[in-house]
Amino acid sequence: LLDRKAPFRTQMDFDNAGFLVGCGDQQVTRVLVALDITPEVIREAAEKGCQLILAHHPVIWGKVGQITDETATGRKVLALIEQGIAAICAHTNLDAAEGGVNTALALRLGLRDQVPLAVDGTDEAGRPYGVGRVGQLEGGPMTVDHFARRAKETLGLSGIRVLDAGVPVQRVAVGGGACGSMLPQVRAMGCDTFLTADLKHDLYLEAREAGIDRKS
């Protein structure tokens, strides 16, 4: 079901999304959804009688040469197995999916006529997919401060860092997670504003020089 909504084949090369822990024939009646699979999340899943954790960030990441109690990853994988809990992680495939992370962010912010920020391929229906979204702000342009307040309130953010390049907000790029490296695509798409979670200082300077309002 998840693979139909956000195909794992669309994940980025560095990613490790997919069915990472468990048995394929395991019966599932209760699912815990989480951003990360931590020891606390595993305990909560066990206490609530869940057979599956669906997480955004992969519980197994990078090169893993062993699964033992001597590493953080090993301890979590062993705990999942001991509790009989499977793990499926949908990361960049969910970021890129139609209706996924970035689509949801863009809709919450009031962006219409959405297109991918960077096209990585096409789905079975021939529609382009890719990480990030670009759209026009409904209701016309607004000030950077106004848009920053909207983003903070709408997305429930505890804080937001703003670079005001002195241009109104109208065509907005959204990149959930660390998407600061996509600034060239933002410029190529003619965006005046970029909302992302990346905080690298050099990219703020580059955005200012390019005349792009940046929020993170």
Kindly label every feature range from the protein language model.
Residues 1-215:
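Hydrophobic structural segments
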